[in-house]
Amino acid sequence: MNAFLSWLLDLLFPPKCMLCGKLMPDAATMVCEKCGYDLPEWEGVPRKIKGYDACSAPFFYEEPIRSAILRFKFHGMQSYAKQFAVWMAARAGEELKGKYDVVTWVPCSRRRRWERGFDQSELLARALARELGAEVCPLLQKHRHNRKQSKIKGAARRRANVQGVYRPLAPGEIRNRRILVVDDIVTTGATMEECGKVLLLHGATQLVCAAIAIARSDQKK
């Protein structure tokens, strides 16, 4: 993009902080200084997800990150993926180093992709892979539409809701691979567990996962 076009876009659509909406001096900076110091950072307390050796996330699922994720998913703010990936890479680059060969994502259904116009977890995975300098590959597909996990209360009901909805997209690409699975949020871990079950069944040797945010224990109910 040439300098004039960049200037014109900034004039017509002035860049704003993705967290509070404050006007920013240029589009290269997506978070204002105040918000940058006021983030709900995850302390890194070990989170056990069945089938995974490690789970990495930079934040708890709290404000202002929560609202930014919702705008990203439901209001077309695809540009947020880059900044989310920068934050995720800063954490995952250390915590998951040497534990994966390829990056993939938790896919949404075709219906959900049509409604939103994109798959938010795919955008995250591709942006994160660029930040980490890693290979990225679609390995799973969601072949059956189900209720939104956010509408279901309780870990057991969430596990039942996702049971059997994923299958391998490219079984040959899974076998003997160490895989980093990306999603936007981890709450009960039911979705990650179901994806992990499919990947391990088809020959994955090690699984780790990463998300933008993770729920506190009292948010998983």
Regions found by a protein language model. Name each.
Residues 1-221:
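Glycine-rich phosphate/pyrophosphate-handling loop used in enzymes and phosphotransfer proteins
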